[in-house]
Design a protein with these regions (language model features):
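FAD-binding subdomain of flavoenzyme oxidoreductases
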Residues: 127-130, 139-291, 557-558
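Conserved oxyanion/phosphate-binding beta-strand-loop segments in alpha/beta enzyme cores
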Residues: 24-59
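Short, flexible, solvent-exposed loop/turn segments with mixed acidic/basic and small polar residues
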Residues: 56-63, 124-130, 260-269, 324-333, ...
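Conserved glycine-rich FAD pyrophosphate-binding loop
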Residues: 2-16, 20-23, 31, 60-70, ...
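Flexible loop/turn segments at secondary-structure boundaries
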Residues: 43, 79-80, 102-106, 145-147, ...
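General beta-strand structural signal in soluble alpha/beta enzymes
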Residues: 34-39, 73, 94-98, 118-120, ...
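C-terminal cap/substrate-recognition region of VAO/PCMH-type FAD-linked oxidoreductases
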Residues: 245, 261-262, 270-283, 287-389
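Glycine-/small-residue-rich beta-strand-loop submotif within the FAD-binding core of flavoenzymes
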Residues: 54-64, 108-144, 183-186, 264-265
Length: 559
């Protein structure tokens, strides 16, 4: 079979060798399940529900800077195993993803351009099991939060079980969990709520972790291993026996997860969402943030961007000043900071919890308490959060990306302790740097069990090369700023993985040395997602593949 010439060949490949790989991959998966990316004109960004599959729809460099040579859509587990074994034979880098969204962190783009994008979600997208008594589901990579929620609704299971969802419901449950993404109910730590994995290792071997390693008595051994019924406790007890391996398969390049168990939240018997608005930036240090679920504290411009784009509020191009931000808050009847949370349980329990919350928060001068029925404006964030906080997915949060024309975004996600003082310091640093870059600060604090995720939404015009460069300058500068304060990021864009990995440098980079040792032991040919989270296999020269950290800030006269 002859194949088209790819826009970017994999490292150390000739066109003939690439064509041979594609031909043999087509024999494994079906030639109809392979698409070669042969020209820049094919790099159409699409949209969230129809994402591009070979590059980043929110590119911070040119679209073809991080781009796959081809996209392969395996039909089942044996297809994935076959592609992995073939990749070892050819030393072909492959970049697996579930749904390919991962917006703000690189989308479906590979870290090594020319890699084969392995699109698991197109065909491998089944809800394999939902168990009421055990309160869990077993899913394939392509199952999205929307899909599992719809499954619960269609099978009349919502009275028994709730799903925890992130801001946008179109993402893969497996993809979000293994990147350690979060939602907003008491089950908001998605990786914490996983239980049991089925994984294809870099040599093509299939394993099940935890209790899944114990065969189920009576399982039909005539079936393929991936088709055999799992142990009845596979989704009930995470650890099994011996070393607990699951964690090394998160944010890593050590295996391809093809099945995952996820715990679902038993219906709590009642629920109430609420919002509390705070009028001043200074209130940030006074807000107490240890509560029942995973609440969020959102800056006014994040909520304003949901309600309308920047041009609907001002004709100013540069970052808004305090007076302009306060005018927007007044127009929307919101605070400078807006806190969204929920309480769960029967009504008497909810009432007690709400009384405690009101007593604590309303002691801050000017703070106001709102229930969803108190708000009637279009695109009410409280109405959206009232769905999200009870596990009903939505797409409403897509609206804030349109704050700028040709809107794109890049997430900066440092971790800190739950402290008003720390939150205020992080906010002051990030707000100042955003202003220097000519961009508005748009962000939120997401409160976990012991920590806060500070999600800074760097929104820029993707068609403006200056804004793209300034966004890169901004986030690289923030990485350095935060490391100097002992704050590290928990997740990042593919372009920044090397820089952030280098900040985790305790004891002469001992953790990275361990990661590289494990990588080279399990993946000696370095075929699986080379460079993922800064971990480069021995077959790549790390110094040649790392991206430089220096970016030049470009000042526009209009800014």
């Amino acid at each position: 079979m002859s194949s088209a010439k790819p826009l970017r060949l994999p490292p150390n490949f000739t066109e003939d060798r690439f064509s041979e790989f594609i031909s043999r991959a087509g024999n494994l998966c079906g030639h109809e399940n392979i698409r070669i990316v042969s020209s820049a004109e094919e790099l159409v960004d699409g949209d969230y529900m129809n994402p591009c599959k070979a590059h980043d729809m929110h590119a911070i460099y040119d679209r073809d800077f991080f781009v796959a040579s081809a996209v392969i859509c395996p039909r089942d587990v044996p297809n994935v195993q076959g592609i992995v074994r073939l990749a070892n034979e050819f030393c072909m880098p492959i970049w697996p993803y579930s749904a390919g969204r991962n917006t703000g962190y690189g989308g479906s783009a590979p870290r090594v351009s020319g890699s084969i994008a392995l699109d698991l979600g197109t065909h491998m997208n089944k809800v394999l099991d939902v168990n009421i008594d055990g309160a869990f589901a077993l899913v394939e990579p392509g199952v999205t939060f929307m899909q599992l929620h719809d499954y619960l609704e269609e099978n009349n299971l919502r009275d028994h079980l709730w799903l925890d969802v992130p801001d946008l419901g179109g993402g893969s449950i497996i993809g979000n969990a293994v990147e350690r993404g979060v939602g907003y109910t008491p089950y908001g730590d998605h990786w914490m709520m996983h239980c049991g994995l089925e994984i294809i290792l870099p040599n093509g071997e299939l394993i099940r972790t935890g209790m899944g390693a114990l065969p189920e008595p009576g399982a039909d051994k005539s079936l393929r291993p991936d088709e055999q019924k799992g142990n009845r406790c596979w989704q009930l007890f995470n650890y099994g026996f011996g070393p607990y391996n699951d964690g090394i398969f998160t944010q890593s390049s050590l295996g391809i997860i093809v099945k995952m168990g996820i715990w679902l939240m038993p219906n709590p018997g009642g629920y109430q969402a609420y919002m509390i608005t705070f009028p001043r930036d200074d209130d940030l240090s006074a807000i107490q943030m240890v509560l029942q679920n995973v609440p969020t504290l959102r800056h006014i411009l994040l909520d304003a961007a949901v309600a309308g784009n920047k041009a609907s509020y001002t004709d100013k191009n540069g970052p808004l000043n305090d007076q302009e931000i306060d005018a927007i808050a007044k127009k929307l009847d919101l605070g400078r900071w807006n806190f969204y949370g929920a309480v769960y349980g029967p009504e008497p329990v909810r009432n007690v919890l709400l009384d405690v919350i009101k007593k604590s928060f309303l002691a801050i001068p000017g703070a106001k308490f709102w229930l969803p029925e108190d708000r009637s404006e279009p695109y009410s964030v409280l109405h959206t959060r009232a769905k999200t906080l009870q596990g009903i997915p939505s797409l409403d949060e897509l609206r804030w990306v349109s704050w700028m024309p040709n809107g794109a975004h890049l997430f900066f996600s440092p971790i800190t302790k739950i402290s008003g003082k720390d939150a205020n310091l992080q906010y002051e640093i990030t707000k100042r740097r955003c202003a220097e870059a000519g961009l508005d600060f748009i962000g939120t604090f997401t409160i976990g069990m012991r920590d806060m995720h500070h999600i800074v939404c760097i929104v820029f015009n993707r068609e403006d090369p200056v804004q793209r460069q300034n966004a890169r300058w901004l986030i690289r500068t923030l990485i350095r700023d935060c490391a100097e304060h002992g704050w590290g990021e928990y997740r990042t864009h593919i372009a920044l993985m090397d820089q952030i990995a280098a900040t985790y440098s305790f004891n002469d980079n001992a953790q990275m040395k361990l990661n590289e040792t494990i990588k080279n032991a399990l993946d000696p040919n370095g075929i699986l997602a080379p460079g993922k989270n800064g971990i480069w296999p021995q077959s790549y020269s790390k110094s040649e593949w790392e991206l430089g950290e220096e970016e030049t800030l470009i000042k526009k006269p209009s800014l």
